[in-house]
């Protein structure tokens, strides 16, 4: 049986030397953004990590192998809609490998693989969480909760994001993170970012002002206190869209999704694309900017964490 996880040589060497490495998810390439924005986002994120002094490690399933440090050819495979790449959460990895499939990795899958590989910092756009109820949907129905939350509770990885995706129930997601014991740190903010928008109205108890402060928290959490949960580092988006504009677009998109019977893994990309159309591309521009910003911050944190361990 071939090894299910393959590390690119640059990633392997950096980890062996105790150097800074940042994992990057690839569902944004396979499903999250349309061409050519998907590849642009991946390349900008990798460049931002390198500019911060760390090694980027895009995680993907390529021809049945979990690759840590996917190269440009692999990313181009995932970016091609004609190849119909799957969307891999953590639970899907074994089955997709067995079937020899290609897949972009979600936050849950990327965090799981990063932890397995020994990578402690991971950059993404926004995490999944508790989905909103569509208008008219009964509250007593089964809640749609992303596996990202459960994986954050068991993978000791710092996930750098612009908070939960704006299409979610942010208050319920924040409560779930608290229940699961996942610390949430605001990056120079005391308010949970709302992905496209810099404020959600949800206060954060803890904030850090720089990468060194974040690294100290991570070391204490994992090493001194022996905690196993991940840590969410929430970074406000650099090109924020007014919250009321985003909320109006989400409300309309939720009704449309319900009318079309769109559920499960298809909901998030559908809603994100609908919000982008409704905001005349402003949301997509904000998405690209925050992805790059998060990758840069993650690179800084990885460098500080590696220096702290030296």
From Swiss-Prot:
InterPro entries linked to this entry: Indigdn_synthA-like, PsuG
Membrane spanning stretches: none
Active-site residues, Swiss-Prot/TrEMBL: 25, 165
A GO MF label: metal ion binding
N-terminal signal peptide: none
Reaction catalysed by this enzyme: D-ribose 5-phosphate + uracil = psi-UMP + H2O
Keyword Lyase listed: yes
GO CC term, one of those recorded: cytoplasm
EC numbers on record: 4.2.1.70
Annotated positions binding Mn(2+): 144
Cofactor or coenzyme needed: Mn(2+)
Binding site for substrate: 87, 107, 146-148
GO biological process: nucleobase catabolic process
Pfam families: Indigoidine_A
Cofactor binding comment, as recorded: Binds 1 Mn(2+) ion per subunit.
Principal EC category: lyase
Keywords in alphabetical order: Glycosidase, Hydrolase, Lyase, Manganese, Metal-binding
Function: Catalyzes the reversible cleavage of pseudouridine 5'-phosphate (PsiMP) to ribose 5-phosphate and uracil. Functions biologically in the cleavage direction, as part of a pseudouridine degradation pathway.
Family in the record: Belongs to the pseudouridine-5'-phosphate glycosidase family.
Subunit organization: Homotrimer.
Protein known as: Pseudouridine-5'-phosphate glycosidase
Gene: psuG
